[in-house]
């Protein structure tokens, strides 16, 4: 499955996908001081509630408007999921034309929402 994470200023939304099917989704309050271990423990608990484990997650990606949490999520993925977690941001190819004066100023949250609608 694919784990997708959208870290917002107040809430973090994430879900698991199998192909085009959304398997499960969750959200919790964004805590800026969260560590990779805390994120891993929270994810593990939520996966287990739905009969899933870390081994079921084969890929992941994160979008974050909270810069200090990006390394925590990527570290969590390496430590607990066993793979690198790409971060959506400037330079990530989306397959969608971005027609604004300075694409590097486009927030990751708006980018992923636009791609989802595209």
Indicate where each model-derived feature is located:
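Short, acidic/turn-prone active-site loops that include or flank metal/cofactor-
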Residues: 28-33, 90-92, 112
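Generic structural signal for well-ordered alpha-helical scaffold segments
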Residues: 44-51, 115-118
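Short glycine-rich, Thr/Ser-proximal phosphate-binding strand/loop in the N-terminal lobe
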Residues: 2-45
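A polyampholytic, Gly/Pro-enriched intrinsically disordered region
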Residues: 102-115
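A general structural signal for well-ordered alpha-helical segments in protein cores
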Residues: 40, 70-74, 111-114
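Short beta-strand-loop/turn "lid" adjacent to the catalytic site in phosphate-handling enzymes
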Residues: 50-105
């Amino acid at each position: 499955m694919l784990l997708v994470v959208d870290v917002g200023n107040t809430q973090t939304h994430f879900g698991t996908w199998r192909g085009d099917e959304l398997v499960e989704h969750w959200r919790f309050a964004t805590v800026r001081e969260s560590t990779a271990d805390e994120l891993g423990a929270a994810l593990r608990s939520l996966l287990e509630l739905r009969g899933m484990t870390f081994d079921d997650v084969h890929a992941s990606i994160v979008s974050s408007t909270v810069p200090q949490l990006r390394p925590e999520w990527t570290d969590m993925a390496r430590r607990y999921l066993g793979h690198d977690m790409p971060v959506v941001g400037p330079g990530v190819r989306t397959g969608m034309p971005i027609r604004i004066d300075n694409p590097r100023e486009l927030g990751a949250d708006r980018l992923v929402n636009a791609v989802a609608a595209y």
